[in-house]
Design a protein with these regions (language model features):
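Membrane-associated alpha-helical segments
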Residues: 212-213, 228
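Conserved active-site tyrosine of GNAT-family acetyltransferases
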Residues: 227, 231, 253
């Protein structure tokens, strides 16, 4: 699933490379002339190399839980790596649950700092992407993938967010309270919140691909009013407004 994270003015330069390889969803770069950038909940963890004080500094950040100003709004240039929803690199597992709506400087990680020092302010996106993919070795960061968190996330994705906690418990064979506890400890949000984010992301996909016929029914909303309210809470726009703005290419997401 191609997740959408940012509401960005057309004055901001944004480019992305979609990977969707089971670990990394996409790589992206933002050149920002001091414009505000809003973040949409996406259920993902990001690794961002932010240009500040003449050098690139590595940060990790978690998902937002509602539409809000992104931390990168005041940064001139950002090279970002968005992991797949529900995927937690090994080095983040001890604190990933604390990253919701915040970010952490990880300059103390030698491997990431070694990548950062190879980036130049005027370097092209393609060159930066080549450097990152050459030095970020999956075997070093994803040694343990088969776990209950990945299983839960997979169920939620397959159901487009339209699944109850009790259904997940039945499919996994675990107690509901146990599942919700370990899921929140790992990702920082409850299974219910995570499912809600995935549902909105699916709605965005439908809107961007003109698959608008009875979206609210396909995504399990009570009625259209319920869908509109939830969509606006998560994106700041009504579905109709979002569709118009997107069709006019006034925003990059």
């Amino acid at each position: 699933m191609q997740v959408k994270t940012y509401l960005i003015s057309k004055a901001v330069s944004y480019h992305e490379l979609i990977l969707e390889d089971g670990y990394i969803n996409k790589i992206y770069i933002i050149d920002n002339p001091d414009r505000e950038i809003y973040a949409i909940p996406d259920a993902c963890l990001d690794l961002q190399f932010v240009y500040e004080k003449g050098r690139f500094v590595p940060y990790v950040c978690g998902t937002h839980t509602e539409v809000s100003l992104a931390f990168i709004g005041g940064s001139k240039k950002i090279f970002g790596v968005k992991f797949e929803p529900g995927v937690v690199p090994d080095f983040m597992k001890s604190y990933a649950g604390e990253l919701v709506c915040t970010r952490r400087n990880v300059s103390d990680m030698e491997a990431l700092s070694n990548i950062a020092v190879q980036f130049g302010k005027d370097m092209s996106f393609e060159d930066m992407a080549d450097i990152f993919t050459s030095h970020f070795i999956y075997a070093d960061y994803f040694k343990e993938r088969k776990n209950i968190i990945v299983q839960i996330a997979g169920i939620i994705h397959n159901k487009k967010g339209c699944v109850t906690i009790s259904d997940i418990a039945v499919q996994t064979g675990y107690n509901q309270r146990y599942l919700d506890r370990v899921f929140k400890e790992s990702l920082g949000v409850s299974m219910k919140k995570y499912a809600g984010i995935i549902r909105i992301q699916k709605a965005i996909y439908y809107l961007q691909n003109n698959l608008t016929y009875e979206i609210y029914e396909r995504l399990g909303y009570y009625d259209q009013a319920h869908f509109i309210k939830d969509f606006k809470k998560n994106t700041s726009l009504t579905p109709n407004k979002f569709g118009k703005v997107n069709s006019l290419s006034l925003i990059h997401i």
